[in-house]
Amino acid sequence: MSQLVECVPNFSEGKNQEVIDAISRAVAQTPGCVLLDVDSGPSTNRTVYTFVGRPEDVVEGALNAARAAYQLIDMSRHHGEHPRMGALDVCPFIPVRGVTMDECVRCAQAFGQRLAEELGVPVYLYGEAARTAGRQSLPALRAGEYEALPEKLKQAEWAPDFGPSAFVPSWGATVAGARKFLLAFNINLLSTREQAHRIALDLREQGRGKDQPGRLKKVQAIGWYLDEKNLAQVSTNLLDFEVTGLHTVFEETCREAQELSLPVVGSQLVGLVPLKALLDAAAFYCEKENLFLLQDEHRIRLVVNRLGLDSLAPFKPKERIIEYLVPEAGPEQSLLHKPLRTFVREVGSRSAAPGAGSVAAATAAMGAALASMVGLMTYGRRQFEHLDATMRRLIPPFHAASAKLTSLVDADARAFEAYLKAMKLPKDTPEDKDRRAAALQEGLRQAVAVPLALAETVASLWPALQELALCGNLACRSDLQVAAKALETGVFGAYFNVLINLKDVTDDAFKAQVRQRISSLLQEAKTQAALVLDRLEARQA
């Protein structure tokens, strides 16, 4: 899996397009960096840049952006609605793919140290990179903002993590760190700034102080007014959207606004958003309104509508959802991007990958897809109207499993490649040999994990498949018969792939546990597939 880190530096300039463009060029021209989004606001006088790349590349991209800003931004003249303490106010590094939080912490440390040494400016570490608990919170570090820095820097407790304890009027100070995806989500109100801020105080985790905490965990919020849009916003930062999601913030804001007789007129997402954040919101509205939507495209459209994400500007999923901008692998590497004819030809070529693992995953994925098809061929038809509620329940697991199993086609090939890469590591010194041995064992565990995940995924489908065999559209009987055997075959392939990769694993307890589990899953697949076929034959008779 290719490594990918997201960097989202916030610069204190949102009006001067020449400055905004110069910083954009500094990032875009950095080898290995892909600039995904530039979001500027005149009222906030702030621009948020989003770019991705390998860990070492995004550090260089952030430094190049800072160098450009150092020549062009003068904080002594800066005014804006958004809290800030420096020309490069905050620079977080965020794991996207194949990267741990610890690696992002190292990115923040490397960036902070080099920035301080080169430009001679104070740099603080926050979030997961913070060296003390008191510096984990960005608002706590920003307290008093730029204007308070001259006095704060004189105090020992506010000594920067890197750079001088000296005030640099043109720059201020920079905060660098590592964190999860932060969603900047603003809800639009036709109200005053004060009314929006009142709602923000009730919702944000900090609340109005220690004695009056807010309702929403992992949420920061303030109220402000956007002159260019002639409306107010409850401006929020969702620090962990898996704790408090977009829909929760929006619905709670609507409830507060209703109590104050204030109209909510949509919302705004600043920067990029993970697909999961939108799908979580879609799941909420589907459950709330008893909706049946399978396709991500439809679910995203629902969320855009319910949250009013296009109220201030068009919301274009292909340009705003990070997974759509940065696919797992390029078309030249991904088996999934290749035509079926090419995939089959590569399987038959003189190469170990793609091999049985990828074929097993593809076979199981098609089995799940066939089951989904049978459900959809039953759902929504007048003659099967009495089964609509049942199909709404049965179809989604097959649809989701088909997508997951499809992704394992590439995952299996990547796992094998990781093992081959470990085989090529040097073994000249004892340290080299130890590193190589550890990498080989990790590669084998990955090679075991993929087919095991395949078998576990198929196992979760058998109850639904049994029920579908009893009530699905009988005209699709052969499709369901093939589905059952395809799923069984997928597990059959997974079983032998697990065993062959377990052979060289040195952890005996792990080997015994996995061998027992995969054997159980294979036996279950044989039994369940036979039962599905028997039930279909009985219905025919």
Swiss-Prot record:
SMART domains: FTCD, FTCD_N. GO terms for biological process: L-histidine catabolic process; L-histidine catabolic process to glutamate and formamide; L-histidine catabolic process to glutamate and formate. The modification Phosphoserine is found at S520. It is found in: Cytoplasm, Cytosol; Golgi apparatus; Cytoplasm, Cytoskeleton, Microtubule organizing center, Centrosome, Centriole. Residues 335-541 are annotated as: Cyclodeaminase/cyclohydrolase. Its EC number is 2.1.2.5, 4.3.1.4. This is Formimidoyltransferase-cyclodeaminase.
